[in-house]
C-alpha cells in the first residue's frame, strides 16, 4: 500500500504541472486560431474609421480590469448582503463604483441610488420597467424609425411585436415632427392623456437634438406616469456638462457605459430615493421605493451573479470621467460632430433635423439615389464603419433611407474638425461610386437581398473602391489607438 501511494505522487505532480501550464499560457500559445482572429480585429480597428456612434475605444486601465482576477469571483446579492463568502474586496469594488457614479453626475446619495449590476442597456431598461410596472401595463417611447430604441417597446404599425418588451407591456410610440425632425411634444402630451401610460421613456438612439426634459416631466405629470430617461448615448456628454442632464426631471435614469462614457460594456440604473411627496392635509410622507423594487428586479428578479470584472472596470472609467481631459474630450466630440455635419451639408447631404446638438448625425439619403444598406456596405469596403438606420417614414430596417454616424470613437483617437471634414469627403466619394455600381447590379438578382449581394461583389471588383480603401487605411492608421502612446 505504501509503495502504491509513493508511486502516485510523481504522477499527480505531472498532471498538476500539466494543468498549470495549460491555464498559465497566453492565448497565442493555447489557441492560435482565436489569436489570429483577435489580431485581425485589432488591425481592423486601427486601420478603420469608426463612425458608429454607439462605439468607442476604452482605456487600457479599463481593459486591465476587464481581464483581471475580478472575473473569477461569484457574488450573488449586493455589498454586505452576498450569498457567497469571500466577497469583502468585491464589495469594496462595487461600493466604490456606485459612489463614483453618483459623484460623477453630482447626485446626493440621500436622494439618489444606483444599481451597477445590469449587464447592458436593453436589460437595464427591462429591469427598470419591471420594477414599476406589471405585465400589461402601458409604456410610451420614441418610435424606432423616429430615433428611438428597440428596448423602448418597438412594434410595427401592423401590430407585430418586434421587441419582447412590447409583448410584456402595452406599448405606444410617440414621434418626431416629420417636417422638423424634432420630437412632437404637443402630440405626445395629448396622446399620453388618452393612453395613460405608467412609464414614459425619454431616450433615443438616433436623434441628434437635445431632449426637453422639463417638457417630458410636465407631460408625465399630466398623465400620472413615471419618467424614465435613457441617456445611453449621451451619458459621457452629460457627465462633462456639455449637454442637458436628465436627473433634475426624471424618476429613473438608465444608461449604458461603453458609448460616450467610454467605459466597459455594462449599464447603470439610477433611481430616486427619499420622500416622493407629502400629503398637504395630513402631512404624511410617501417615500420612493425604487431602491427596493429596482434592486430586486435586477437580482434576484432577472440576474444571478454580477460581472465583477465589468463593475470594477466601470469604477475606473468613472474616475477617468471626472478629469479635465475627459471634459475637453466631450467638448471636442460635439465640436467635431457640428463640423462633420456642416461639411456634409455643404456637399449636398440632407440631415434629419438639419444638424446636431450632440455626438451623432443622421443622414437622409432618400433623394440621393442610394439607400443606407448599400452605403454602409461600400463604406465598409473602404474601411469606414457606419450603420444603416431608419428615418421617419421608412418601412424597412434592413434597407432604410438613413445612415447614422458619430464622432466619439475617432475623437478618442485624436480626430479634430478637419479630419471629420475629410471623412465627409470620403463619404461623398463613396456615394458617387455606389450610385454608379448600383446601375451595374446583376439582372438576375430579383429580390433586394440578392441585389445587395450583387452590389457588394461589384464593390470587391472595383479598382476605385480598392484604391479608396487603401487610402483610408493608410491615413487612419497614423492615428493611435489606446495604449500605443
Swiss-Prot record:
Catalytic reactions of this protein: (6R)-5,10-methylene-5,6,7,8-tetrahydrofolate + glycine + H2O = (6S)-5,6,7,8-tetrahydrofolate + L-serine
CDD domains recorded: SHMT
Example of a GO MF term: pyridoxal phosphate binding
Disulphide-bonded residues: none
Pathway connected to this protein: One-carbon metabolism; tetrahydrofolate interconversion
Cross-referenced Gene3D superfamilies: Aspartate Aminotransferase, domain 1 (3.90.1150.10), Type I PLP-dependent aspartate aminotransferase-like (Major domain) (3.40.640.10)
One Gene Ontology cellular component annotation held by this UniProt entry: mitochondrion
EC top class named in words: transferase
Pfam families: SHMT (PF00464)
Top-level lineage group: Eukaryota
Known cofactor(s): pyridoxal 5'-phosphate
Gene Ontology process terms (BP): glycine biosynthetic process from serine; tetrahydrofolate interconversion
E.C. number(s) listed in UniProt: 2.1.2.1
Compartmental location: Mitochondrion
Entry keyword set: Mitochondrion, One-carbon metabolism, Pyridoxal phosphate, Transferase, Transit peptide
Modified residues annotated as N6-(pyridoxal phosphate)lysine in this record: 259
Further information: In eukaryotes there are two forms of the enzymes: a cytosolic one and a mitochondrial one.
Family: Belongs to the SHMT family.
Biological function: Interconversion of serine and glycine.
NCBIfam families: PRK00011.1 (NF000586)
Subunit annotation: Homotetramer.
Name of the featured protein: Serine hydroxymethyltransferase, mitochondrial
Species the sequence originates in: Candida glabrata (strain ATCC 2001 / BCRC 20586 / JCM 3761 / NBRC 0622 / NRRL Y-65 / CBS 138)
Amino acid at each position: 500500500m505504501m509503495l502504491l501511494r509513493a508511486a502516485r505522487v510523481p504522477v499527480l505532480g505531472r498532471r498538476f504541472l500539466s494543468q498549470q501550464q495549460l491555464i498559465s499560457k497566453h492565448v497565442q500559445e493555447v489557441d492560435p486560431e482565436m489569436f489570429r482572429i483577435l489580431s485581425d480585429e485589432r488591425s481592423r480597428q486601427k486601420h478603420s474609421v469608426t463612425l458608429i456612434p454607439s462605439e468607442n475605444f476604452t482605456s487600457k486601465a479599463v481593459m486591465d480590469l476587464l481581464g483581471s482576477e475580478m472575473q473569477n469571483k461569484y457574488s450573488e446579492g449586493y455589498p454586505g448582503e452576498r450569498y457567497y463568502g469571500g466577497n469583502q474586496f468585491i464589495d469594496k469594488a462595487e461600493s466604490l463604483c456606485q459612489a463614483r457614479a453618483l459623484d460623477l453626475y453630482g447626485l446626493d446619495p440621500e436622494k439618489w441610488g444606483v444599481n451597477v449590476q445590469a449587464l447592458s442597456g436593453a436589460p437595464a431598461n427591462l429591469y427598470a420597467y419591471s420594477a414599476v410596472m406589471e405585465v400589461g401595463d402601458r409604456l410610451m417611447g420614441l418610435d424606432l424609425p423616429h430615433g428611438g430604441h428597440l428596448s423602448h417597446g418597438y412594434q410595427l404599425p401592423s401590430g407585430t411585436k418586434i421587441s419582447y418588451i412590447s409583448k410584456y407591456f402595452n406599448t405606444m410610440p410617440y414621434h418626431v415632427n416629420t417636417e422638423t425632425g424634432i420630437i412632437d411634444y404637443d402630440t405626445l402630451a395629448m396622446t399620453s392623456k388618452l393612453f395613460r401610460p405608467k412609464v414614459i421613456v425619454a431616450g433615443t438612439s438616433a436623434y441628434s437634438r437635445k431632449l426637453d426634459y422639463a417638457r417630458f416631466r410636465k407631460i408625465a405629470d399630466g398623465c400620472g406616469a413615471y419618467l424614465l430617461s435613457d441617456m445611453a448615448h449621451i451619458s459621457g456628454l452629460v457627465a462633462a456638462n456639455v449637454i442637458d442632464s436628465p436627473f433634475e426631471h426624471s424618476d429613473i435614469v438608465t444608461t449604458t457605459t461603453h458609448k460616450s462614457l467610454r467605459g466597459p460594456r455594462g449599464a447603470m440604473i439610477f433611481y430616486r430615493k427619499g420622500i416622493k411627496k407629502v400629503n398637504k392635509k395630513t402631512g404624511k410622507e410617501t417615500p420612493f421605493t425604487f431602491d427596493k423594487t429596482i434592486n430586486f428586479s435586477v437580482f434576484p428578479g432577472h440576474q444571478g451573479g454580477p460581472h465583477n470584472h465589468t463593475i470594477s472596470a466601470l469604477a475606473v472609467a468613472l474616475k477617468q470621467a471626472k478629469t479635465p481631459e475627459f471634459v475637453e474630450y466631450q467638448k471636442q466630440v460635439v465640436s467635431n460632430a457640428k463640423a462633420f455635419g456642416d461639411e456634409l451639408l455643404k456637399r449636398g447631404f440632407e440631415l434629419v433635423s438639419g444638424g446636431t446638438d450632440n455626438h451623432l448625425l443622421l443622414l437622409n439619403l432618400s433623394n440621393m439615389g442610394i439607400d443606407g444598406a448599400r452605403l454602409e456596405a461600400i463604406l465598409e469596403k473602404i474601411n469606414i464603419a457606419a450603420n444603416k438606420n431608419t428615418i421617419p417614414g421608412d418601412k424597412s430596417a434592413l434597407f432604410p433611407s438613413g445612415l447614422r454616424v458619430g464622432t466619439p470613437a475617432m475623437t478618442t483617437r485624436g480626430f479634430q474638425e478637419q479630419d471629420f471634414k475629410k471623412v465627409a469627403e470620403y463619404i461623398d466619394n463613396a456615394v458617387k461610386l455606389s450610385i454608379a455600381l448600383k446601375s451595374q447590379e446583376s439582372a438576375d438578382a430579383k429580390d433586394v437581398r440578392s441585389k445587395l449581394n450583387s452590389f457588394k461583389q461589384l464593390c470587391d471588383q472595383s479598382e476605385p473602391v480598392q484604391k479608396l480603401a487603401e487610402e483610408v487605411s493608410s491615413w487612419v492608421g497614423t492615428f493611435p489607438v489606446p495604449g500605443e502612446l
